[in-house]
Amino acid sequence: MAIDNRLLPNTLAAQAAALPSAWSQALAAPGVAQALDHIINHVEARLAAGATVYPATPLRALSSLAPSEVRVVILGQDPYHGPGQAQGLAFSVPDDCKCPPSLRNIFKEIGRDYALDGKPGHDLTPWVKQGVLLLNTALTVEDGQPASHAKRGWETVTDALFTQVAQDPTPKVFLLWGAHAQAKAALLPPGHAHLVLSANHPSPLSATRAPTPFIGCGHFRLTNEWLEKQGQTLIDWTATFKKIPAQAEFRL
């Protein structure tokens, strides 16, 4: 049975108010607070009109990480627009949800460099716990209507969040997949020390397309090689896979 991931009426403003104070710099930037108020009002109006909006926790990507704790940024575009899918983390869905095609290609690319043993878990929370920010540029969507809340104010908010992370003095990795994400490179400060890796979006429509195919890009390995040079702990990209005990392990 699919998890009920519908956003409840009159909850988005409270979720925004409960964000860690470390994000307040971005949310207090000129025009950002107004944009956030605008999108909250739009979402509440759509809910009052009977629309189904996903996910239940649009700001989840920010609730577990402060900007200084972010080590890797992966940008998505729009939450999944089907029931039981979106959970507030870019590309991530609950473990019992069918694996979306883009996430399947992400796992395929990881598997080129790392052994994927066990049952794949589609919930990418284990990455978040290691400092990976999984941020969509629009944070809500209506059922069956992709990009329905794009251009409603979310981009102003998420651009400010991206900028705050990019201005943090600790170097980070930015994985920019597809033209939409790559356009955000313009928000990086001049002379930054970050590692920026670009490739096509992992969608089946573009994952193997030249000149910068996603499949074969090596971004997960390159990220860890760079983190190692920085003296940082590597990301366990296989952490979402659930170990299946061998038959012998059940013996007494």
Curated annotation (Swiss-Prot):
Q: What is its main location?
A: cytoplasm
One GO MF term: uracil DNA N-glycosylase activity
> Which cellular component, as a GO term, is one annotated location?
cytoplasm
Instruction: List localization entries.
Output: Cytoplasm
Q: Which UniProt keywords apply?
A: Cytoplasm, DNA damage, DNA repair, Hydrolase
Q: Which Pfam families match?
A: UDG
Q: What SMART domains does this protein's entry cite?
A: UDG, UreE_C
The EC number(s) given in the record are 3.2.2.27
One BP term from GO: base-excision repair, AP site formation via deaminated base removal
Xref: InterPro entries: UDG_fam1, Ura-DNA_Glyclase_AS, Uracil-DNA_glycosylase-like, Uracil-DNA_glycosylase-like_sf
- Catalytic activity field: Hydrolyzes single-stranded DNA or mismatched double-stranded DNA and polynucleotides, releasing free uracil
Q: Active site: which residues?
A: D78 (proton acceptor)
SUPFAM superfamilies xrefs: Uracil-DNA glycosylase-like (SSF52141)
Coiled-coil region: none
Q: Which family does it belong to?
A: Belongs to the uracil-DNA glycosylase (UDG) superfamily. UNG family.
Provide the function of this protein. Answer: Excises uracil residues from the DNA which can arise as a result of misincorporation of dUMP residues by DNA polymerase or due to deamination of cytosine.
Q: What is this protein called?
A: Uracil-DNA glycosylase
What is the species of this protein? Bordetella avium (strain 197N)
What phylogenetic lineage does the species belong to? Bacteria, Pseudomonadati, Pseudomonadota, Betaproteobacteria, Burkholderiales
Gene this chain is encoded by: ung
